[in-house]
């Protein structure tokens, strides 16, 4: 099953690293490229769901893209999906 969450992208000019933040799950990752951040985020979402299942923990529903975009004005916001087994 595929799960999709909004992710906020922040580019750090000092370190030249992209940061990705998934507010609904409180997950954070970074990478030298956007592709690295997407790959990292996908793995984190999969791991999050794996742990939530293992520990019988409720997973928050995703916010809408509009909600996150309005909250994180001035930042790039995109959707990230992960296949959960």
What kind of feature is each model-predicted range?
Residues 5, 18, 27-29:
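Structural detector for hydrophobic anchor residues on beta-strands
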Residues 1-6, 39-85:
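Short, charged, surface-exposed hinge/linker loops at domain edges
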Residues 9-23:
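Short aromatic-glycine-(Arg/Gly/Cys) micro-motifs in beta-strand/loop hairpins
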Residues 8-9, 32:
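A ubiquitous short alpha-helical element
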Residues 25-36:
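A short, exposed loop/beta-hairpin motif centered on an aromatic-Gly-Thr core
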